[in-house]
């Protein structure tokens, strides 16, 4: 990939958005490729704010609803990065065009519906390029960081149980809010509050689904609930882990209430209801940030066959910046020739966890506690 595509451009769809801007900034620093910022309307490349007047930035008007235009634009690209949404509205359009012209794809979203659709297509006809989807913080880092913890602590031991707890708070964009509301209905699968046993979701009772988790700094103690996670189920199957549990919570108080309302009223069932609930969630989360700071936290607990437990916690203060950097690091690994399989895959299945985390930590965006006895200077002063 590195030798063949070195002079071909990278297309960043949604490169003028909050996540897309971070992707472009990183790629300008760490690659030599021309970067095409594709959007629905005529924005200049300098409006991106990454590096004004950088000769490597080019703008392109591109409609994700026009399959022919997508194929034409993607045919000469080294890589397509999709930072557009909502994922539940976008569907397979971008991925399908990439498959048809044999261009690799990194998608910030996608989630379970796209994963299943692409796997079904892949069973009918082989896909000749990597399609890495759900490359963000959740899902994305929620699969790769647990893999990293296991890769760093197993030392030949067999993991018997894996628990993850993910919390988040930010002023969610409408597209993010749309996908959050859509996920509240488990994308139509209705698996309740599940424990993952031998890679399969098994629902448990409401009171068995709750867990309180303590995060570092000023985040403190947080109430979380079991939630379905196809990503964690795939990781458990990949590593033959008998039991896994994914807990989560939206820790913005107003946003949490908006999510609870959407869940109880079934506002995830139709696009019209999702639209209205997403608008309310976006407004509620913006109000949360009048007095609170954005934060993303992920705790991982691994229990091994020797009955020893290893724990690690990761905290990020800027969720959209970190999401963009995670996407861009994935792109960097692909462009630099890391050995990647063809076909649809999630982040933890595609990229070596230790290489990814080494590059991520070098950006100074995250704090990790629990994997080393060495002090972390990023913790100094605490987190708010």
What positions do the PLM features span?
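C-terminal catalytic/substrate-binding lobe primarily of soluble NAD(P)-dependent oxidoreductases
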Residues: 3, 20, 151-384
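N-terminal Rossmann NAD(P)H-binding glycine-rich loop of SDR-like oxidoreductase domains
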Residues: 10-28
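N-terminal Rossmann-fold cofactor-binding loop
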Residues: 38-42, 64
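Conserved Rossmann-fold cofactor-binding substructure of NAD(P)-dependent oxidoreductases
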Residues: 61-77, 86
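Short acidic/histidine-rich motifs immediately flanking catalytic phosphotransfer sites
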Residues: 74-80, 100-101
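ADP-ribose/adenylate-binding Rossmann-like module
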Residues: 86, 95-115
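Rossmann-fold NAD(P)-binding glycine/threonine-rich loop
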Residues: 108-130
């Amino acid at each position: 990939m590195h030798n063949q595509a070195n002079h071909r451009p990278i297309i960043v769809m949604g490169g003028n958005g909050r996540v897309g801007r971070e992707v472009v900034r990183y790629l300008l620093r760490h690659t030599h490729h021309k970067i095409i910022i594709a959007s629905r309307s005529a924005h200049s490349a300098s409006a991106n704010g990454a590096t004004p007047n950088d000769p490597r930035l080019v703008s392109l008007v591109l409609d994700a609803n026009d399959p022919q235009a997508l194929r034409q634009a993607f045919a000469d690209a080294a890589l397509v990065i999709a930072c557009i949404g909502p994922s539940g509205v976008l569907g397979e359009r971008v991925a399908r065009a990439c498959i048809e012209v044999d261009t690799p794809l990194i998608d910030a979203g996608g989630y379970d519906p796209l994963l299943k659709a692409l796997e079904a297509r892949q069973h009918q006809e082989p896909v000749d390029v990597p399609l890495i989807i759900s490359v963000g913080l959740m899902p994305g880092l929620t699969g790769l960081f647990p893999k990293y913890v296991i890769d760093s602590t197993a030392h030949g031991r067999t993991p018997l149980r894996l628990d993850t707890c993910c919390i988040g708070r930010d002023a969610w964009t409408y597209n993010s809010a749309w996908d959050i509301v859509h996920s509240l209905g488990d994308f139509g699968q209705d698996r309740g509050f599940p424990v993952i046993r031998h890679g399969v979701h098994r629902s448990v009772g409401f009171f068995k689904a709750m867990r309180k988790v303590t995060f570092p700094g000023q985040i403190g103690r947080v109430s979380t609930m079991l939630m379905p996670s196809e990503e964690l189920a795939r990781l458990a199957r990949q590593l033959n882990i008998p039991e896994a549990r994914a807990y989560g919570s939206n820790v913005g108080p107003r946003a949490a209430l908006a999510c609870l309302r959407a869940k109880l009223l079934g506002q995830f069932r139709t696009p019209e209801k999702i639209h209205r609930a997403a608008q309310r969630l976006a407004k509620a989360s913006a109000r949360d940030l009048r007095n609170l700071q954005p934060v993303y936290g992920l705790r991982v607990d691994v229990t091994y066959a020797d009955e020893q437990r290893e724990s690690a916690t990761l905290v990020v203060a800027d969720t959209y910046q970190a999401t963009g950097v995670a996407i861009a690091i994935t792109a960097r690994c692909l462009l630099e020739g890391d050995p990647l399989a063809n076909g649809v895959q999630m982040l933890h299945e595609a990229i070596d966890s230790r290489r990814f985390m080494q590059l991520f930590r070098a950006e100074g965006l995250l704090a990790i506690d629990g994997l080393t006895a060495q002090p972390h200077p990023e913790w100094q002063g605490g987190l708010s």
